[in-house]
Amino acid sequence: MMGRNDDAFHPLLHSTPESSVKIPVPLVSVGRESSQSKGNMKTAILIWLTLQNSIHTLLIRYSRAREVDAMFVSTVAVWLTEVIKCFICLFLVAQEETPRRFIHALRTQILEQPYDTLKVCIPAMIYIVQNNLFYVAASHLDAATFMITSQLKIFTAAIFTVIILRRSLNRTQWFALAVLFVGVSLVQLQGTKAKESSGESPFVGFVAVVVACCLSGFAGIYFEKILKGSAPVSLWMRNVQMAVFSIPASFSAIYMQDSKTVNEYGLLYGFDSIVWLTVLWYGVGGLSVAVCIKYADNIAKNFATSVAIILSTIGSIFLFDFIPSFTFLLGASLVIFSIFLYSSHQSMVAALGRLRGEIPSTKEAFCL
């Protein structure tokens, strides 16, 4: 039993006058509050990821498929998205530092380390091309097909993981990738049978998604290699470094692709509340990876993706008169199944790593 002096150093232990029994009531209360707080946070993140994935898909499709007098220029939307992301990241970096240290951090980590900043040039450029391709895909595919087909990024990320990072996949993961490929193919069958109307081409949309997913897979794995092989820099600062290249590159793409329209009507031609909402949602959603890293595990991420696929399908039915066929529903089910199957091995490895006190890899942390 502890002596009187020892008790003085344990304020959480309550001793009654009648007995020397210590009752750690406050400790239990604190533990319950902490557990409840974590549970509430995970629930909030789960809801956010689900809404972000589904609403983003429906918004980008609706902004491109609706009938309007003036259609906005997608390259301008991509550029504004990069600007918004940069300002958000600068704000978050500034919140972590005093104004003086904030300016010092920008100078030392961007200007005084040009080689380190130059490393993110490749993924920054790739993400610009990828985002432009996603707008092309959204112009030719319904929201549900677009959402499901874009899950090919899991397949491409896995392939580049084997090629670039020299990691091996087990049989379960290879089987999951095969199921994913079959599921996407079945979903695309409905798209190829659909009538091409209003200048839409499901084949063009599918090719755009496939190329975008290949670029996304390569950029994600390349970015992981940068993070693991470079000096420690916060994720927000890395995004600021990428903005150094992505903002001028995306602005150049405007005049390379849509100079005639922009020169005649201006940058904000066709922009209305729906377009601005799409751009803002795209910008905030692009930073959701940081939320995944800090709070969400693979199970939460995959559940959010699966529910988002279902919500996107339901939204497409009501907003775009989309009628899913049996092959579409079968393909969607296979895609959802493959997502959980592929990550089940990763979740197990991550759990073992935590038990051993290891740091999870960026591949586990990033929402690929």
Curated annotation (Swiss-Prot):
GO terms for molecular function: UDP-galactose transmembrane transporter activity; UDP-N-acetylglucosamine transmembrane transporter activity. Its main location: Golgi. Disulfide bonds: none annotated. It is a multi-pass membrane protein. GO terms for cellular component: Golgi apparatus; Golgi membrane; perinuclear region of cytoplasm. The keyword Nucleus does not apply. It comes from the Eukaryota. It is found in: Golgi apparatus membrane. GO terms for biological process: UDP-galactose transmembrane transport; UDP-N-acetylglucosamine transmembrane transport. Disruption phenotype: Worms display altered surface antigenicity which prevents bacterial adherence. This is due to a deficiency in both O- and N-linked glycans. The chain crosses the membrane at residues 72-92, 118-138, 145-165, 174-194, 203-223, 235-254, 273-293, 317-337. Belongs to the nucleotide-sugar transporter family. SLC35A subfamily. This is UDP-galactose/UDP-N-acetylglucosamine transporter srf-3. It comes from Caenorhabditis elegans.
